[in-house]
Swiss-Prot record:
In the N-terminal section; belongs to the ubiquitin family. In the C-terminal section; belongs to the eukaryotic ribosomal protein eL40 family. Keywords: Cytoplasm, Isopeptide bond, Nucleus, Ribonucleoprotein, Ribosomal protein, Ubl conjugation. There is a cross-link at G76 (Glycyl lysine isopeptide (Gly-Lys) (interchain with K-? in acceptor proteins)). InterPro entries: Ribosomal_eL40_dom, Ribosomal_eL40_sf, Ubiquitin-like_dom, Ubiquitin-like_domsf, Ubiquitin_CS, Ubiquitin_dom, Ubiquitin_ubiquitin-like. In Drosophila ubiquitin is encoded by 3 different genes. RpL40 and RpS27A genes code for a single copy of ubiquitin fused to the ribosomal proteins eL40 and eS31, respectively. Ubi-p63E gene codes for a polyubiquitin precursor with 10 exact head to tail repeats. SUPFAM superfamilies: Ubiquitin-like. One of its GO terms (molecular function) is protein tag activity. PROSITE patterns: UBIQUITIN_1, UBIQUITIN_2. This is Ubiquitin-ribosomal protein eL40 fusion protein. Residues 1-76 form the Ubiquitin-like domain. There is a cross-link at K48 (Glycyl lysine isopeptide (Lys-Gly) (interchain with G-Cter in ubiquitin)). The record marks H68 as: Essential for function. GO terms for biological process: cytoplasmic translation; modification-dependent protein catabolic process; protein modification process; protein ubiquitination; translation; ubiquitin-dependent protein catabolic process.
C-alpha cells in the first residue's frame, strides 16, 4: 500500500509499505529516500507520536494515510569559548533604572528619550 509522509518544509514523500511494517522499517525507508537518520526522525499520525516497535496496523494507518515527519530537537553543551562569548554579549550590560533599557557595559547615560537620557544606571544582575 502507499502512504505519504509530509515534512515541516511542506515536501511530501511517497512510500510503499505493508500494514505489517514496523515504524522502524518506515523510518529506514525515509532514510533511504531523504538521508535523515532514523534516530532523528519523529513520526506523528492522528496527533500521536509513533513508537518504533509498533506496526502501521497498530495505529490503524491505511492506504494513502499521511504521516507527519518532524526532527528531534538537538541539545547539548556549548563549547566553553562560545559560552563565554554568549555570556559577555547577553550579561555584561548596564540597565537604565527608569526605563529598563539594556545598554552597553561602558554606558554613562541612557539612549532612550522617554527617560530623558538619565545617568541613573546599574549593572545587569548576574545569573545564579
Amino acid at each position: 500500500m502507499q502512504i505519504f509522509v509530509k515534512t515541516l518544509t511542506g515536501k511530501t514523500i511517497t512510500l510503499e509499505v505493508e500494514p505489517s511494517d514496523t515504524i522502524e522499517n518506515v523510518k529506514a525507508k525515509i532514510q533511504d529516500k531523504e538521508g535523515i537518520p532514523p534516530d532523528q526522525q519523529r513520526l506523528i499520525f492522528a496527533g500521536k507520536q509513533l513508537e518504533d516497535g509498533r506496526t502501521l496496523s497498530d495505529y490503524n494507518i491505511q492506504k494513502e494515510s499521511t504521516l507527519h515527519l518532524v526532527l528531534r530537537l538537538r541539545g547539548g553543551i556549548i563549547e566553553p569559548s562560545l559560552r563565554i562569548l554568549a555570556q559577555k554579549y547577553n550579561c555584561d550590560k548596564m540597565i537604565c533604572r527608569k526605563c529598563y533599557a539594556r545598554l552597553h557595559p561602558r554606558a554613562t547615560n541612557c539612549r532612550k528619550k522617554k527617560c530623558g537620557h538619565t545617568n541613573n544606571l546599574r549593572p545587569k544582575k548576574k545569573l545564579k
